[in-house]
C-alpha cells in the first residue's frame, strides 16, 4: 500500500531517509513530501515518531476530476459508513492546482456535501463539522484533473508537539527545527558526548526539540496523550496502543539518561521566560541551561565539541542590516571554533554575512519564507582563503551576471511551487552573449549545482577573438552567480572550420549525476555528449502525462533515455513500454528505471524501429508519447523524415489507443507543418504547445510544438 507524508519544502530527502529508518519499504521524495510504500502500521508509526513530517495521509480513493460534479460523484461513491461513525465530526482540508476548480474552500465544501448526502441516503445521522478537532479529518489533493481523497491519520499538523505554552514573535515550527538539528548532526554529536548551543534561542524551540531527540522521546507522545490521533473507523487501535506502549518505555529510559549538555541564551528576558515555561511543559527543563545575554557576550560551554544551532532574526527591519549576522559569526569563531554550526538564515546574503565558510548549503522554507541553511564544520575554517585576489568581472561579464540574477529572481516562486531543480537559467537573453545555460542540481549527496553551457553559432561577420572573449565573460559570470567551480561547468563550444561552425570534441569524463524531476531520480551525463539525457523543455508535458498515467498503460515511442516512462512509472502507471532503435538509449532507460526501484515485466524495453513496431503491434495503450527526431538514418531501419512520415506515424499510433486513450505528439523541427486534413481522417487533434512551455523556455517558445490526439 502507498501513503503520502507531507513536509515543508526542502525537507523531502531528509524525511524520506527518516521514514525508511522507521521501517517503510520504500520512500520516494517528491514536491513537498514523500510517497511511501508500507502498511497502515508504518503510517501510524510515522504519525507517532516522525520529527519532520507535516501530515501523514492514508488514501481512500483516487479518480479523474475535471470539474466539481466529478469531485462530488467520486466522493459519493465511497462507503462513508465504513469510515465515519454515527455522531462523529468531520473536517476537510483541500489543496487544488492546475484544475478547473480554483478555490480550495469550495472544493472542501463539495466534499462535505457529498459525505453528508451519502450518509443521509443510507438513513444515517448527518455528521457535524468541527474544524479544530474533528473525529475524522479528510484531505483532498486535486492536481491537474486528478483527485486523491485521504484520511489525515495525525488529525492535523504534526509539528505541534503539545509542549508550546508561550512563544516570542515568528516562532520556528518544530519539524523545521528538527531538520536544522539533523543537518547539523546533533544526534551523533550527543552520542559522542558533545553539547548543544543556541545563542539566540527565542522561545527555545531548537533546544527543546534537541533535548527530546537526545532523550529518544516520540514527538507524538505528548501531542496525543491517551487519545487517538484519528477516530477513522479503519484506524488500527490495537496497533497504535502497542506503538505508544513501546514509545513510553523508550521515553522513560531516555529521559532518565538525558545529560545536561544543552545551553541557550537570548538578549530578551521575556523570550527566556517563555523558553523556560516551554521546557518545563516538555519535561526537559532540568537538561537545558537558559540565560539572558547579548550574542557578543556568549560564554564558551564546558564541552570541547558540539553543535551550534540558531535561527537568527530575519524580519524586514533586520534583513537590511547584516551587522547582527557578522557579530554572530565572529562570536562563534571565538567561543566555539571547533564546534559544528547549523544556522537557519533569512536568505543567502545574510548567510554570507556571517563570514563563516559553509561546507553545505540547503534551501528550506519556514512557512512561506525561503531560508538558507548553512552547515559549517568546523566553525573556525574561514570562508575564503584565496591564493590571490579575485579578479573583478569585466563590464560585459557583469551585464551577464545581472541578467542571471534577474532571471533567478523571476523563476524563484515558480521553481518553489513546482519543485523544479533542473532548469534553463539563460537563453541568449543578451544577443551578443549567445548561449544557453542550464542548471542541474544534484539530487543526492551535497546537492551540488552543475552548469551545462551550450554555445550558439555566432555570425561569420563577428571576429573569432570577440566570440571567445564573450564566451569567457559569460562563463565567468555564471561561475560567480552560481558559486560553481570550473570543474562543474560542462561547456559545449563551437569551433569554426570548413563547413562552418560545429561543436568541438567533448570531454570524456564518464561522470554520471543524479537529478530529480517530478519525483523521479534520473541519470544525466553533462560532459560526454551534446545532449545530457534530459530534455528540459519537455518538463511540463512529462508532468501531465505522468499524472494521467496512474493505473494506466503508458507507451513511449522514440523513448531516448526513457525519462517520460520513468516519471509515468513513479506516478503509478500500471505498465510502461519504451521503444527505441538505439541499444545505448535503452540501456540508459533501464538504468533510470532501476535507479527508482522499477524493474520487471511491468516495464518493457523494446529495441526496434518505432514506426515498423507500431504497424506490427496489436496491444493497446491508454497514454502514448511520440517525440520523434526530425531526421534519422540507420542501417537497421529505413530513413525517417518527420515532415514526410508524420501522418503515417500518427495513424499507426492512434490505432494503438485504447478507448478513452490519448496520444501526445511533439517535435522540435522549427519548419514542421502538421497535415491537419490528413490527421483529421483518423483523429481529433488539438495544438497544446503553449501549455507545454514552462517559464524558463518562454523566451524561445518554439523550441518544440505539441499536439493532443484522440481517436
Swiss-Prot record:
It holds the Pfam family THUMP. Belongs to the methyltransferase superfamily. RlmKL family. It comes from Xanthomonas oryzae pv. oryzae (strain PXO99A). This is Ribosomal RNA large subunit methyltransferase K/L. It catalyses: guanosine(2445) in 23S rRNA + S-adenosyl-L-methionine = N(2)-methylguanosine(2445) in 23S rRNA + S-adenosyl-L-homocysteine + H(+); guanosine(2069) in 23S rRNA + S-adenosyl-L-methionine = N(2)-methylguanosine(2069) in 23S rRNA + S-adenosyl-L-homocysteine + H(+). GO terms for molecular function: 23S rRNA (guanine(2445)-N(2))-methyltransferase activity; RNA binding; rRNA (guanine-N7-)-methyltransferase activity. It comes from the Bacteria. NCBIfam families: PRK11783.1. One of its GO terms (cellular component) is cytoplasm. Specifically methylates the guanine in position 2445 (m2G2445) and the guanine in position 2069 (m7G2069) of 23S rRNA. Its main location: cytoplasm. Residues 42-153 form the THUMP domain. SMART domains: THUMP. Its EC number is 2.1.1.173, 2.1.1.264. Keywords: Cytoplasm, Methyltransferase, RNA-binding, rRNA processing, S-adenosyl-L-methionine, Transferase. It is found in: Cytoplasm.
